Amino acid sequence: MSNSKPLSLTDAVTTWYMKKLKSKPIQTKALTSATLSFISSVVAQKFIEKKKINWNAVVKFTVWGLISSPLVHYWHIILDRLFKNIKDKYQSWGKLIVDQLVFAPFINIAFYSVLAILDGKPKSILFKLYFDLFPTLKASWKVWPLAQLINFRFVPSHLRVLFGNLVGFCWGIYLSILATKKRN
């Protein structure tokens, strides 16, 4: 008979998730991101905008979550390699600067491009970027630098995408509202 007590539901789910993260990191991160994107879109529409759920928008935002997570996964690998020989105290700041000046514009361009394609309006990409990219970046720079500094400084590398997903849940609500307003 074992002296260990049975795992709580939280412990069991955490253990299962960590195993999946190790055995299938990209799929696990993509499905996590898609799930949180789905939930954030529903929350934004139903509880913040207080309107009937536009399931078409929810599906598009969920697809975005599925696509974006692998990009973020590989971005973190690139950052880790770029800054591997830098002292710890400078590493986080270096990653933050490169992340916000290179990846933030890239991921937001990708966001608007993917949504335009999913809307069946690929010709509107440049128009959307012209009007929406800088306001979105300005808004993101109010949230993501602090979140990413915490992420780069304190979160183990295998959990950084998950941490970003959790911050992104709130950010996703904002983006979902923004994307829905821009489409209407």
Swiss-Prot record:
Alphabetical list of InterPro entries matching this protein: Mpv17_PMP22
Signal sequence coordinates: 1-44
Major place of residence: membrane
Keyword Zinc carried by entry: no
Domain of life: Eukaryota
Compartments, record wording: Membrane
Residues spanning the membrane: 58-78, 97-117, 159-179
Record key words, sorted: Membrane, Signal, Transmembrane, Transmembrane helix
Membrane topology classification: Multi-pass membrane protein
S-S bonds: none
GO cellular component terms given for this protein: cytoplasm; peroxisomal membrane
Pfam families according to UniProt: Mpv17_PMP22
Keyword field contains Isomerase: no
Assigned protein family: Belongs to the peroxisomal membrane protein PXMP2/4 family.
Stated name of the protein: PXMP2/4 family protein 3
Species of the source: Dictyostelium discoideum (Social amoeba)
Upper classification of the organism: Eukaryota, Amoebozoa, Evosea, Eumycetozoa, Dictyostelia
